[in-house]
């Protein structure tokens, strides 16, 4: 059930764009075939996003091709340690043409805990999921907190939130978020220093 919720959450994070023509599709896996669609301002580039949820030896990947705003392209890539040995990772590839090159996913680093932690949470249909302690590893010294919602005709208003450890703060902010014609809203993008674990 956790994987089902996560897959749904990954699809929500990638907003549909609506004056360039780009390929449009979503799928579970590494690639998808779709149809060409006109983009509208501020979505001015074509993009391909690969998303992955990894937990221990298991992983699920999804692919999304769409129109994007240049601000989304600045993210490039992200790796969020959501705790419980689980990661959500993304690779964003933007280009002038419909075909975009992939950025491969490297293997997860075998990093050790670094003495810091962040609130960890992953929620769908809620902005206030129960938090747990996500133990940061390696170079992860920042805490990320993203909250938003997306309106669909069915099932309606879908809320989501994501919290965990990251190595650096993303360039994404509320000021450059894509609102997708009042369908997709980022309500909070917060990044701050991780919390040091208490000494035993």
From Swiss-Prot:
Q: Does the keyword Signal apply?
A: yes
Question: Where does it primarily localize?
Answer: secreted
Provide the record's note on post-translational modification: The carbohydrate moiety increases the inhibition capacity of CNF, but is not essential for activity and for oligomerization.
This chain belongs to the protein called Phospholipase A2 inhibitor CNF
Q: What is the lineage of its organism?
A: Eukaryota, Metazoa, Chordata, Craniata, Vertebrata
Keywords recorded for this protein, A-Z: Disulfide bond, Glycoprotein, Phospholipase A2 inhibitor, Secreted, Signal
Tissue expression from the record: Expressed by the liver.
The transmembrane segments are: none
| SS bond partners | 22-46, 25-32, 39-67, 73-94, 95-100, 118-143, 136-165, 169-191
The residues the entry assigns to the signal sequence are: 1-19
Give the family from UniProt. Belongs to the CNF-like-inhibitor family.
What is the role of this chain?
Answer: Inhibits the PLA2 activity of crotoxin (CTX) by replacing the acid subunit (CA) in the CTX complex. Displays a pro-inflammatory action through activation of important main signaling pathways for human leukocytes, in vitro. Abolishes both the muscle-paralyzing and muscle-damaging activities of CTX in mice phrenic nerve-diaphragm muscle preparations.
